[in-house]
Amino acid sequence: MVSFDATEALAPYREGRGYGAILFDRERLRQADASLFSPQSWGDRARPVDAGGRGGAWFVDAPFGHSVLRQYLRGGMAARVSRDRYLWKGAGRTRSFAEFRLMRELIKRKLPVPRPLAACYLREGVGYRAALLMERLENVRSLADHAQVAGRGAPWEATGQLIARFHRAGLDHADLNAHNILFDAGGHGWLIDFDRGVLRIPATRWRERNLKRLHRSLLKLRGNRSREDVDKDYARLHRAYELAWGRGY
């Protein structure tokens, strides 16, 4: 369960035929409006993110610091129905508000995640659109990048230890792939993209599901490397994970 946070602020707004709300960190933002979530409003201070994901993300040079703006987009078969609209089930269950609050809870638990700054939804009828603004992690590279460039020299053991920390805290990451694991120049690891993530009682089934998803993503990214090489790298990651899990950190 995600606890209540007194530093959150809520600002309702209207746009066209819809109405919505913005949830924001009042320690970082004095006020918030819908323009925060429009890349057009940022002009040349916003540029598209071209690594991983399905688009809909921008690096933003904002007055309150370097940030990432992400609009929620659907993938797969669901995108044929609507690219950016989700079924309304209540404000607290919007993708943006849920991810904002989950990230803040993970930070409270001393886990390395980017700080969320603001989240919004705009409801029109039975559907809504949503977006999230968060701090940008500077000078980081994804595990996907490390794996393609360094291969065996990528931080496999550090990745296993990092995932074990999050699993110990109960995080079930809905999309644990090599693009969502980042390392800075000092070797410190971070996780990103907590859309549809939840906190659970640690259990083998969902932990292994997360790890298998990561393994599949590494296989997809292997390029000219053999499956055997990728499996060996993943085995190193998994051994480090099991050791860290067994130690309790």
From Swiss-Prot:
EC identifiers of the protein: 2.7.1.166
Upper lineage: Bacteria, Pseudomonadati, Pseudomonadota, Gammaproteobacteria, Lysobacterales
Family matches, as Gene3D superfamilies: Transferase(Phosphotransferase) domain 1
Gene Ontology annotations of biological process type: lipopolysaccharide core region biosynthetic process
InterPro entries the UniProt entry points to: KDO_kinase (IPR022826), Kinase-like_dom_sf (IPR011009)
Pathway: Bacterial outer membrane biogenesis; LPS core biosynthesis
Example of a GO MF term: ATP binding
Membrane topology qualifier: Peripheral membrane protein
Superkingdom classification of source: Bacteria
Localization: Cell inner membrane
NCBIfam families membership: PRK01723.1
Active site: D175
Function: Catalyzes the ATP-dependent phosphorylation of the 3-deoxy-D-manno-octulosonic acid (Kdo) residue in Kdo-lipid IV(A) at the 4-OH position.
Pfam families: Kdo
Family classification: Belongs to the protein kinase superfamily. KdkA/RfaP family.
This protein's name: 3-deoxy-D-manno-octulosonic acid kinase
Keywords on record: ATP-binding, Cell inner membrane, Cell membrane, Kinase, Lipopolysaccharide biosynthesis, Membrane, Nucleotide-binding, Transferase
Catalytic activity field: an alpha-Kdo-(2->6)-lipid IVA + ATP = a 4-O-phospho-alpha-Kdo-(2->6)-lipid IVA + ADP + H(+)
Gene Ontology cellular component list: plasma membrane
